[in-house]
Amino acid sequence: MYCISVLFIISCTNKSNKQFDQGKRGVVSSAHPLASEAGIKILESGGNAIDAAVASAFVLSVVEPSMSGIGGRLQAIVKLPNGEIRGVDASTQVPEKYDSNTHPKNSYGYSTIGIPGVVAGLVKLSKEYGELPLDVVMEDAIHYAENGYKILPGESYRQMLAKDQIEKFGGTKKYFLDEKGENFSSGDLVVQSDFAKTLKIISENGKSGFYDGEIAKNIVDDVQQNGGILTLDDLKNYEAKDSRVLSGNYRGYDVHTLFLPSYGAITIEILNILSHFNIDELDQVEWVKMFSDVFRIAYLDRPKQKYEDSLELILSKDYAKKLFHSLKESKASKRTNAELNGE
């Protein structure tokens, strides 16, 4: 069976009010019980872990749009039955007409919309690594969009926090506010008929169903009429790519992560530094302080991920050892200064 980690972790429990669920052929964990149940259903229907991941991801796009909508980006890491590790990069890309010197510096709105990668990434995963047809894998997502689902407290709360932004645009007002113009409350039944139609088209046509044809035209028309620069060519030319896999080792365990835009290299660097600490000897306060210091010093290396020489450096054990000693020396220096000052 394939193993996968996609923006969320696939898995599950016997109780439907949990975010994980368990079946006879595997475990699925996601941010929503309906997504986890969808993954288990696929496993028990003969699908593999990739099929389950894709099913769960599409359900999340329905029931948790604030965190997992199809308008975002995706990265996935996959372990094949032969042990080979592969990655998928479906990152959001900037439109062809984007100019950093003249483009508005907004934090949200139509001018900030790039080329979404989630659909291309999920279809690539399904096509290259899945076993079941895409229309079968997407059945539950379409069902919940068409017939409705009860919104959970977390999603309701996040949409409430974004109400000011939601009210600024006709599309978001239509789909994320009720008939009275209020946010949906926890337990409300939310039906997304238009989104169900979109998902059906994707399930029948794959990538082209979203990045070409009627859906693409509707997206581009809406974006351009409201100040965005996305074009039909931007969508049509988008491709999810194979992602570079980075590998390390932590206390005897192999660690596999992904290259940019994931911070996989920083994750390995953090683990390499942590491997020099005797964590069992630390009390709770020391443990928290140590982790904070390690994360802080590793995050300073984020720009180094872009270049091959510096990438190799931050992945190296020797570099991690130097950083470990610099943290120890800094801690000793602070302790000495405190003692001299009578603290």
Language model segments and positions:
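Bacterial N-terminal signal peptides
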Residues: 1-9
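Flexible, polar/acidic helix-loop-strand segments at domain edges
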Residues: 265
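Phosphate/diphosphate-binding loops
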Residues: 277
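Internal maturation/activation junctions in enzymes
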Residues: 280-343
